[in-house]
Regions:
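Charge-dense, helix-prone N-terminal extensions
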Residues: 1-117
Length: 117
């Protein structure tokens, strides 16, 4: 699964939603310049050293970020209080970008959790 498959996946979304998802993709790529972009579990995912770091996708009523760790959301509980969540996802509006500052915090928390034994 390659970067081209991620691009193809995103082309399936309506233009306005696709713009938001492409922006998120670019921000994640800037934060994780060595990551590979793949499709994992049917969603675009950034992988570092063979480990999924963060995924994202769009849906009919929301977009989602998948930190591949339910613990990330609990670590950032207060920062994520305004976002609907499931055990493995953080939902955000279809028409509004996900805050880059919060994206950085999610990535930082993910890497810190990965360092724990």
């Amino acid at each position: 699964m390659t970067k081209a498959l991620v691009t193809a996946h995103l082309k399936a979304f309506p233009m306005e939603q696709r713009k938001i998802l492409e922006l998120l993709r670019g921000q994640i790529a800037a934060e994780l310049p060595t990551a590979k972009q793949v499709i994992k579990y049917g969603i675009p995912t950034f992988v570092v050293d063979g480990k999924p770091i963060i995924g994202f996708s769009g849906y009919k009523k929301h977009n989602s970020i998948f930190p591949y760790s339910g613990t990330v959301a609990s670590v950032l509980k207060s920062e994520l209080r305004n976002y609907e969540q499931t055990k493995g996802s953080i939902h955000f509006a279809i028409d509004k970008p996900f805050p880059r500052v919060l994206l950085r915090k999610i990535l930082k928390a993910k890497f810190e959790l990965m360092q724990q034994p």
